[in-house]
Amino acid sequence: MAEKLGILGRKVGMTRIFASDGSAVAVTVIQAGPCPVIQVRNGETDGYDAVQIAFEEAKEKHVTKPARGHFAKAGKGLFRNLREIRLEAPAEFEVGQELTVSLFAAGEKVKVTGTSIGKGYQGVMRRWNFAGSKDTHGCEKVHRSGGSIGNNTFPGHVFKGKKMAGHWGDERVTVKNLEIVDIRAEDNVILVKGAVPGPKNGLVLVRKQ
């Protein structure tokens, strides 16, 4: 499925700025780009249309030998992160071209993809907001349990998708319709209204809506 173009960046953290009417706006600071184009794929040779972009320079010892050869074709150095974005018209881009925050404009809506903060193994009360059992009146050792998970004889198994305790977080999450409040092109910084997935210094992909 074709997507809109975007660039990679790091979530610096959250702060607030003041609008012209004096109201405080919570924003996320994203250090984005520059992202050089490493490869342009097309339907004739690759079977699909896409653009590969890179982010954050890396030392040679931290890059595998096959990846070094791949980066060498672009002639832009070695990088830590490589991401492929499927596009409808990748022909307008060329290898070596640098993508910066100038792709976007203040007031534009974007979607941000990142990896949510991992919470480890959690019970149903924290993971799914269950109410839990009674605190007293005969309740013993099951105060935070999830209760019944199904019948015995029939169906005789737990239905797929049943909300139970388990690993929470550390998943790929996309937040849509985030407004760009300001762009600091000289610092490669985008200020996005609201929160984006992931911890501080987490890798994110900012794409046009």
Curated annotation (Swiss-Prot):
Gene3D superfamilies registered for this protein in UniProt: 3.30.160.810, Translation factors
KW Ribonucleoprotein (keyword) present: yes
Listed GO CC annotations: cytosolic large ribosomal subunit
InterPro entries: Ribosomal_uL3 (IPR000597), Ribosomal_uL3_bac/org-type (IPR019927), Transl_B-barrel_sf (IPR009000)
HAMAP family recorded: Ribosomal_uL3_B
Subunit structure: Part of the 50S ribosomal subunit. Forms a cluster with proteins L14 and L19.
PANTHER family documented for this protein: 50S RIBOSOMAL PROTEIN L3, LARGE RIBOSOMAL SUBUNIT PROTEIN UL3C
Protein's name according to its UniProt entry: Large ribosomal subunit protein uL3
